[in-house]
Amino acid sequence: MMEHPENSEEYKGLTVNAGIEQPSMVNPYLKLRKKPRRREYSVDEFVDGIVKGNVTILSQAVTMVESLKPEHQAIAQEVIEKCLPYSGNSVRIGISGVPGAGKSTSIDVFGLHVLEKGGKLAVLAIDPSSERTKGSILGDKTRMEKLSVHPKAFIRPSPSAGSLGGVARKTRETIILCEAAGFDKIFVETVGVGQSETAVHSMVDFFLLIQLAGTGDELQGIKRGIMEMADGIVINKADGSNIEKAKLAAAHFRNALHLFPTPDSGWTPKVLTYSGFYGLGIQEIWEMVDEYFEFVKKNGYFDYRRNEQAKYWMYETINEHLRDSFYNNPTIETMLAAKEQAVLNGSQTSFVAAKQLLDTYYQLLK
């Protein structure tokens, strides 16, 4: 095809208009507008706002907790320390289940039910993150349609950033801040994959496992450890033609639980059916939860579990700081690449390479 037909004798009658340049899709005046800077609060302002129940300040404090910047971490740790005396007065419930079990929809219904009795609810929804990009869907809030607009509810979807089992590294600190802000009920939802349940179990008082009926072998793919952690198991979507399947699934789970030793709490986990979509069976689930708390507070296990969790997180924090200190050391960073290559080409064993790295690190500490 000829590039400029207007210059050819063959097309001498052809005229070409210059045309009109299309305007930019970006409003040029936006560049002139100054972005409003988010106000930076002092530690005392953070604490005062949180204790007074200011959700805006609470959200900013949680952002500081999740930040990887050292200056933000320093402020966050001070805020947490000062909020600690106001925490510990909530009911912490972990909610997990296979992907597609309807966790977010169920939390929407559960949350509205507990808020009818009074109090405030914080939902910490842990979204799956990509192991490659560390990106997160952060879509849980959109699936909690009614709860997300409730004045007494605070929903905080947090990216798991590839941490252990998909659980956000700073969830426990966020729980402390939410409790200090007056939220007396805390829900922690896990991604339902990997080892996330173990981490959540170590920061909640009651662990609720949501399962589905009518998916074939109901017990297939459920790890023994997760079953042992559950304080209650509920079968979702028990409605319509699925009711009988849900009852059968519940029977399978009850039989399986009989094979496990009695939990340290002395509580025998119950299995119930419900429909999150239609809101059926919700009352019975929360009667079970209330019964559990009455049981463990009476026999002293509630306080024992809280103390064990505090001890666990002390060791986890130590491990985390030691790990960060090691991997962020400039000398170690340089050595790691060389040692990794030595292991890959077979010139060194994994154990020798690791020992040399650790010996170097210990020498640097002297």
Predicted regions located by residue number:
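Long, well-ordered amphipathic alpha-helical subdomains in the mid-to-C-terminal portions
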Residues: L58-Q60, T273, E284-Y362
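Short beta-strand/turn micro-motifs at beta-sheet edges
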Residues: T142-R143, L219-R224, L259-P263
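Alpha-helical scaffold elements adjacent to nucleotide-binding pockets in ATP/GTP-utilizing enzyme cores
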Residues: I137, T174, A199, M203, ...
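Flexible active-site lid/hinge loop adjacent to a nucleotide/diphosphate
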Residues: A213-E244
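Nucleotide-state-sensitive switch-loop elements of NTP-binding domains
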Residues: S42-S96, A101, T105-S196, M203-I210, ...
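Canonical P-loop GTPase G-domain recognition
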Residues: G232, A238-F295
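Short hinge/gating elements
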Residues: V43-D48, A101, V234-D239, K270-S275, ...
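Non-catalytic terminal/linker segments enriched in charged/polar, low-complexity residues
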Residues: M1-P85, E333, A337, A354, ...
